[in-house]
């Protein structure tokens, strides 16, 4: 918006600029993005804003007498994809496909389709899929399109697409089948997930670890532990599959849900032996399962073991272990690990402290929560909506209403940037506080603010109407707000009016 306004002002004040063509504008953008010693990749990576054109940079590069090879363009596009710069990544592959001198691989077609979904949506991706020139490339591109259907929970489209792929003979691996099972699990169609397994067996499509994990979860939903154990035994006998921590954790979770604690603990110990020092994911997955068993020792053991994995321990890792310790009731250790994170963090992520802040407030430790909040501010932490929600709810619970109202105002100021909504109980508690203490003006401002945010309810309006009656004030504007909010009047409201 600001850029458009700037160009509009320049156009009005300097007529010579209005005579410049679109081509000269593109050239000026390209020149600002490129210096004499830049290579093609550096020039494109400098395009920070999506509106700027990677296509223009490539074309300018080629027009200047340089070459752009398939391998170089491929590398740049994949790097941009990893950085979530989808528009520029798509522009590169689109330009590449239009060049007769450059060949698109099957993987290029698949990635381009994936990028089309991210930038333009499924409809355009479907159109592109039908234009892919050969079966090898279609085979590669079918998975990202199917994944798009799964992500959108588009069951009918996914099923129709699978029928089409089957007719073309393109279902030769477990991956499309796994996508369908994920879709059926997400939409609670567990019997259909089992039908996918039957189809795989009928067509002799080999299963992988994910296939078995999804199969076990579907069986758990339909027929319980015994059928899950049968699937697990079949997996053990499958020479093409190695049972790892993920399958064992799936089995352990089934046991936990079934109340078979001893079996769950035995399987979790077996899963721990499958962990490696290559990746931390398994450690934290098992840690959460131990937490569900209220097994503090298991949480500690996995936390310490995870430190043997190379690389920096992330904020997400710290959030996981602190959350687990809070859930098993060990706030002392949770605080110790929080302080460990704080001593090593590069950027102060308020989400980490929010976990401990929430634990303090839920346990009635208001002074500890207030002290932690002040400490995070001193350290440069920036409160988010969750911070204010935690403080607001804690202060309402402890009767510190002035502080709660202040936190509410700060939380409301953030509503335009997020989808957070305070609970109706908290809003009603604040309204009742205003009513009890005769704070008529404050109550009016509060309910109007809640109305503008679309959060008003019948109990809130009742409270404000009672105050209007007590103060002998007209309530026409309140009734108008109720009408806009489509609040139906009950007998109590009618009596007040």
Feature map (PLM): residue ranges:
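N-terminal targeting peptides
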Residues: 1-146, 151-160, 164-175, 188-192, ...
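Pentatricopeptide repeat
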Residues: 37, 69, 73, 89, ...
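Inter-helix linker motif
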Residues: 65, 100-101, 134-136, 153, ...
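Residue at a conserved register position within TPR or TPR-like alpha-solenoid repeats
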Residues: 77-80, 116, 149, 184, ...
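Residue-level detector of the short coil/turn that links helix A to helix B
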Residues: 84, 120, 153, 188, ...
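C-terminal structural cap/anchor segments
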Residues: 361, 367-436, 446-449
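C-terminal interaction modules of eukaryotic adaptor/scaffold proteins
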Residues: 436-497
């Amino acid at each position: 918006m600001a850029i458009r306004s700037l160009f509009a002002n320049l156009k009005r004040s300097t007529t010579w600029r209005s005579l410049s063509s679109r081509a000269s504008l593109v050239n000026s953008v390209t020149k600002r993005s490129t210096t004499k010693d830049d290579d093609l990749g550096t020039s494109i990576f400098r395009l920070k804003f999506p509106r700027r054109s990677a296509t223009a940079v490539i074309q300018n590069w080629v027009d200047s007498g340089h070459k752009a090879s398939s391998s170089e363009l491929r590398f740049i596009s994949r790097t941009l994809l990893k950085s979530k710069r989808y528009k520029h990544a798509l522009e590169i592959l689109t330009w590449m496909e239009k060049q007769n001198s450059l060949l698109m691989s099957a993987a290029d077609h698949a990635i381009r389709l994936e990028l089309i979904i991210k930038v333009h949506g499924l409809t355009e991706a479907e159109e592109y899929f039908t234009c892919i020139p050969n079966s090898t490339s279609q085979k590669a591109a079918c998975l990202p399109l199917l994944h798009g259907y799964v992500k959108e929970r588009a069951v009918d489209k996914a099923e129709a697409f699978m029928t089409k792929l089957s007719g073309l003979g393109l279902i030769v691996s477990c991956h499309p089948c796994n996508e369908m099972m994920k879709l059926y699990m997400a939409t609670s169609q567990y019997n259909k997930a089992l039908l996918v397994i039957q189809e795989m067996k009928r067509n002799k499509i080999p299963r992988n670890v994910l296939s078995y994990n999804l199969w076990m979860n579907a069986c758990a939903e339909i027929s319980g532990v015994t059928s899950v154990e049968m699937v697990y035994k079949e997996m053990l006998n499958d020479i093409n599959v190695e049972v790892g921590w993920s399958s064992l954790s799936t089995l352990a979770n089934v046991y936990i849900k079934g109340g078979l604690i001893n079996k769950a603990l035995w399987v979790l110990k077996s899963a721990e032996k499958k962990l490696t020092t290559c990746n931390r994911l398994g450690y934290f997955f098992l840690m959460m399962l131990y937490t569900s068993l209220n097994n503090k020792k298991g949480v500690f053991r996995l936390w310490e073991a995870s430190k043997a994995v190379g690389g920096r321990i992330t904020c997400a890792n710290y959030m996981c272990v602190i959350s687990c310790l809070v859930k098993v009731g060990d706030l002392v250790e949770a605080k110790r690990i929080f302080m460990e994170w704080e001593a090593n963090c590069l950027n102060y992520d308020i989400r980490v402290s929010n976990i401990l802040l929430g634990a303090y407030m839920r346990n009635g430790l208001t002074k500890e929560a207030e002290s932690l909040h002040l400490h995070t501010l001193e350290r440069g932490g920036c409160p988010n909506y969750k911070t204010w929600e935690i403080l607001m709810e804690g202060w309402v619970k402890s009767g510190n209403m002035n502080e709660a109202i202040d936190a509410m105002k700060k939380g409301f100021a953030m509503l335009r940037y997020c989808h957070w909504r305070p609970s109706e109980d908290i809003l009603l508690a604040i309204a009742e506080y205003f009513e009890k203490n005769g704070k008529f003006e404050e109550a009016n401002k509060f309910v109007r603010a809640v109305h503008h945010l679309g959060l008003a309810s019948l109990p809130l309006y009742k409270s404000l109407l009672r105050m209007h009656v007590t103060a002998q004030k007209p309530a026409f504007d309140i009734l108008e707000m109720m009408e806009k909010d489509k609040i139906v009047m009950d007998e109590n409201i009618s009596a007040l009016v």
